[in-house]
Structure formats: C-alpha cells, structure tokens
Amino acid sequence: MDDETADTNEIQRKSARVTHGQPDRPGGVPGRGGRKTLWCTLGAAAVLEVAIIVWWIVPSSKSSALSDCAGLATHAEQRRCLDPIFENAARSENAQTVLHTLTKLVRTGVLDDCHLFAHEFGHVEFEVQGSLAIAMGAGDASCLNGYYHGVVEAAVYHAASEGKVDIADMCRDLRGDDLAYDACDHGLGHGLLNVNGDVMQSREDCASLPGNYDRQRCVDGVLMENSMRYLDLDDGHYRKSAPHACAGLSLSPADLDSCNAEIGEIAMFHYKHNLNAAFEICQAVGNSSGDAACERGAREELVTSQRAHQSG
C-alpha cells in the first residue's frame, strides 16, 4: 500500500462515525451531525455525568462544565464532552442559557471560539425538537449565527433521510427575521454537503433557491463545510488533507477564491486562532492565488474572533 492510499484510508477511518442516526454519507467523508450513537458507544466520564446532573441545580456549574470541556486538547474531544450537556439543555428547553454561557466563555477567554460548538448545539437541538421552526425559535444568533447554521444543517440531513429534501421553501417562514433567514440560507449549504458529500452537486442544489443572494449564501455554506469536514482529523492528517480541500473542483474564479479562503478560516478554528499555524496550511495550498486567498481568510477570521472576544 503506498503512502497516499494509506493516508486516505486513515482519513476515512478517523472520520468514520454515524450522523443523525444515518449511514456515513457518500464520498468517504461523513457528515458532522448528531452523535447519539457515539454517546452510547463512548459513554461519558464520571465527572462529566456529575456535571450534567448539577448543571441546572447550581448556576455556576454551567460555566464550569462547559469550560472543562473547552479545556480538552482537540475539537473532537471537546465536542464529545459537550454533546451530552447539549442534549440535556435541549431536553430542558434551556438553549438560550447554553448559548449565553458559551459567549461568556469566549469573552472571558476560557473558550477560544464558540461558533463551531454552537453549530453542534444546533444539531442536537433539532434532533430533540424535530422541527426547524421550533429549534430556530429556541435559540438566537449568538456565536456568529453558529446555532442557526447547525439547526438548518441538521434539518436538511433529516429531510434527506426521509427522501424529501426541498430546500427552496425550507427558510421561507424565517423571512421576517433577517439574521435567521440569512443564517438559514447559509445552513442549507452546510446541510447539502453533509447529505451528498459532493461540492459540485451541492452547489447545483443551491441554484434552486429563489434569489441570487440566497443562492450565494447557500454556496458559501457549502464551501465552508467543505473545509470543516477535515476538522476532526489528527494534526498530521489535517496538514496533509486540508490544504487541498478545493483541488480539482470546477468552480468559478470567485467561488474558487472563496473556497480557498475557507481553508484559512477553518484552519484558524483547528489551531485555536494561531495565525502562523494557519498560514502553514495556506502555504501548502499549492498555488500563489490559492495561498493568498487562504491567508486572507485566516486574517479575516482573526479579526472576527477578536471582535467576538469583545462582544460575544
């Protein structure tokens, strides 16, 4: 077996997991949806179980339990720690409390960023509620709309599992709320790529949306998810795979630029907003325009993160 084949097999093995109770999606890179099967397989450490029990009894335990999870070394470990807490909160109808606690942890420097964790919480909330409208109404635009994105992503996957994806109308009822509607368009893109694992097919599916802005926001979600799907790899495999997330895609120049910018943005999440580490990923993209777009995406994410630390 050559090194490239071995690396591909390792990437698929590291990424393999059940999403929203459905089989891994086509294309070898599974979706990032719910982890109910994973919870049953992995269980939770005794200290985490105690934290969940006292979560709603002792107010300070909310920040403590979340900060304990945030202190874990990798995104995958953090997510596994947080998921049982998120499910407990969703079942207790305390979505706002979780989101406000996450933003507080960002402001105080305990948590590097809460956007991806809010994505994850959105997945869990939808799984518990089973309704896009109810899940969207339970939360808010905290963590740069991450919660909204996650809810819609999960809703698309759920609809696909029942064979009835019709994204043209999924966000219609949110048109009176500009933030939620914009986040819904973007979340559709995340969800589409989770369903089919194919960037070009997902981009075509976005074309069914009613307006140019809606379509582009959907494509933006596809391109962001295209880089996010490497986040759970160990660093060695992340370095080998993430820089090439856009290689071989027949995108327009503008979309290719955005795709490469997402490599830099997501590298900032992977490296907890270490700009130099993200730049190392960008320098491996393989061409000057791609490298530059990637570095721009990393810089823009740094600015966004700094603002979030000030305002939540």
Segments (PLM) and residue ranges:
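Short, aromatic- and cysteine-enriched interfacial helices/patches
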Residues: 29-32, 57-59
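Hydrophobic membrane-insertion alpha-helices, especially the h-region
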Residues: 41-55
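N-terminal cationic amphipathic segment used for targeting or macromolecule association
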Residues: 4, 14, 42-44, 265
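N-terminal intrinsically disordered, acidic low-complexity segments at the extreme N-terminus
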Residues: 1-27
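Non-catalytic all-alpha helical scaffold/repeat segments
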Residues: 61-312
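C-terminal region of N-terminal signal peptides and the immediate post-cleavage residues
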Residues: 52-64
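N-terminal Sec-pathway targeting helices
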Residues: 31-45
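N-terminal non-cleavable signal-anchor helices
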Residues: 19, 30, 48-51
